[in-house]
């Protein structure tokens, strides 16, 4: 606060909020600017939540319903609703009306969405914070519907896609903890099903749940729940790693850990979640957006089976864009794992080469290359190079059969508990396609800035972008021809490791602010059109116990036992 500037008196912001809400027409951005992350006053919570859920002024969806409570599972619905009423401090004369409201909301939702009710869905716990707002039945339904639609992910059940995604996020930030849970066969759905399905209301007290929802609904980001869940795990890490209990007991301890949250913990919970969020690639959201929202939008899910993904995948467009931005944010150190002849024919100009074939063919040279890689990463960050980044992103060819060795290298780094490890989605083929797509006027508009060649064939590579294919027929952007030229076997022997590191640092030391080229996010449909669904991330190499955690790059052990 500037010198001489007086702090607003206590309750001043609450008065401003009340006035803004009273005037009407208040949007979420206005509300957020007034609240600034503080806990909402009880008497204003209902209005703010309705704004955050975008249900202000919505009609009564139940108006045309006949009110018949006649589903086959109606007795189960009634029983669960009655148990909720019994747990709440509700005046006796209001219980019957409230019971009918809750049962009507669930019944109508099941009928209108053609969903079969089951107690394990956790809807009762999701309704509890809303019931405490004492909303009219129409608002209660609209709020419940909005939460289900916007904030509860599709397939939120055992072995569902949301939990495979959470495991990848955990592995990205806390590989040691993830590996430990993997070895115990404690999958995220075994302990976090009710965290995600009830937005923490299953285990947290009413006050704590309200405080969490106050912040979460204002975020207007459904993926933020993943980072709140991550912080719960990170907070319990030491306890988890020290546990010697059996699997079932450990799951119980972990599952109930949100119950330990208190009101004064919520501010730190959100601050830490924001930090981890800022250290996560944007592709985490962009590539999984179909998890949330209308079922019609999610019918065509990503081809990648997240249960088989070795690690988080990052789009090539994000890789190019991320290393141009200044200040804080995710920046990638790209590791090209293709054979030397493919790398020399053409590669991302900022990429470091680590020939994955060496892992089996020459382990000692591979070990030296890994040490050089980590040293190059460290120096590129310190020098302000555009190639510098904390986040390691491995790039293969994009062909599953060719990337098997790269997957082994990836598994090697993950086994060593290296954080911030990802894979370039679609590999070098996807990079070629993206650069061809955004440079519609040919290589002179910027293609050469990103593709480098150490074989003297840059001109032939560039000319193939908008030239004819080898068989004489043009494919528009010459991508097929480009792929052929880039992957031709030159049988060039790999350069000396030391010289490679020096050359890499010298050639990529341009400060970030000297690169004005702005890469746009590609149209999602465009990528899906050109990158085949067979270009998978690759088969996983999991189930390997962690050897040790990296504390110092100089001590990185790369000997393959």
Predicted region positions:
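Rhodanese-like catalytic fold shared by cysteine-dependent sulfurtransferases
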Residues: 284, 288-317, 332-333, 337-561
């Amino acid at each position: 606060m500037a010198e001489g500037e007086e702090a607003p008196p206590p309750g001043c912001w609450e008065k401003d909020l009340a006035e803004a809400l009273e005037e009407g027409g208040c949007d979420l951005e206005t509300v957020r600017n007034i609240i600034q992350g503080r806990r909402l006053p009880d008497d204003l919570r209902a209005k703010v939540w309705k704004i955050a859920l975008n249900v202000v002024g919505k009609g009564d969806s139940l108006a045309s319903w006949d009110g018949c409570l006649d589903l086959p599972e109606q007795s189960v619905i009634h029983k669960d609703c009655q148990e909720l009423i019994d747990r709440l401090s509700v005046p006796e004369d209001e219980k019957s009306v409230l019971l009918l409201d809750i049962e009507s909301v669930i019944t109508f939702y099941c009928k209108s969405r053609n969903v079969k009710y089951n107690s394990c869905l956790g809807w009762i716990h999701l309704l509890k914070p809303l019931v405490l707002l004492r909303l009219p039945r129409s608002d209660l339904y609209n709020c419940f519907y909005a939460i289900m639609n916007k904030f509860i992910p599709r397939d939120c059940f055992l072995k569902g896609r949301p939990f495979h995604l959470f495991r990848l996020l955990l592995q990205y930030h806390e590989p040691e903890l993830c590996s430990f849970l993997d070895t115990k066969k404690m999958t995220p759905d075994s302990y976090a099903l009710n965290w995600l399905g009830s937005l923490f209301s299953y285990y947290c007290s009413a006050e704590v749940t309200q405080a969490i929802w106050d912040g979460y609904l204002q975020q207007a980001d459904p993926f933020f729940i993943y980072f709140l869940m991550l912080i719960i795990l990170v907070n319990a890490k030491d306890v988890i790693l020290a546990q010697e209990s059996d699997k079932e007991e450990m799951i119980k301890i972990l599952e109930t850990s949100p119950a330990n949250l208190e009101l004064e913990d919520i501010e730190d919970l959100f601050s830490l979640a924001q930090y981890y969020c800022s250290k996560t690639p944007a592709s985490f959201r962009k590539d999984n957006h179909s998890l949330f929202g209308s079922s019609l939008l999610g019918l065509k899910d990503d081809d990648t089976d997240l249960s088989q993904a070795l690690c988080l995948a990052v789009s090539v467009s994000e890789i190019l864009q991320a290393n141009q931005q200044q200040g804080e944010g995710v920046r990638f150190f790209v590791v090209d794992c293709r054979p030397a002849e493919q790398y020399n024919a053409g590669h991302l100009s900022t990429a470091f080469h680590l020939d994955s074939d060496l892992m089996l063919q020459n382990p000692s040279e591979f070990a030296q290359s890994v040490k050089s890689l980590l040293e190059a990463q460290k120096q590129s960050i310190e020098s302000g190079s555009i190639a510098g980044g904390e986040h390691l992103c491995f790039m293969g060819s994009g062909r599953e059969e060719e990337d098997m060795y790269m997957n082994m290298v990836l598994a090697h780094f993950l086994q060593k508990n290296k954080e911030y490890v990802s894979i370039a989605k679609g590999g070098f083929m996807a990079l070629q396609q993206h650069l061809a797509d955004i440079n519609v006027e040919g290589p002179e508009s910027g293609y050469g800035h990103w593709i480098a060649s150490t074989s003297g064939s840059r001109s032939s590579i560039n000319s193939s972008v908008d030239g004819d294919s080898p068989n004489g027929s043009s494919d528009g952007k010459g991508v097929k021809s480009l792929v052929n030229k880039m992957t031709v076997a030159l049988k060039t022997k790999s350069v000396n490791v030391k010289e490679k590191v020096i050359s890499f640092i010298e050639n990529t030391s341009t400060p970030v602010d000297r690169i004005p080229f702005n890469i746009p996010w590609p149209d999602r449909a465009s990528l899906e059109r050109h990158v085949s669904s067979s270009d998978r991330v690759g088969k996983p190499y999991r189930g390997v116990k962690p050897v040790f955690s990296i504390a110092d790059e100089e001590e990185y052990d790369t000997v393959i036992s």
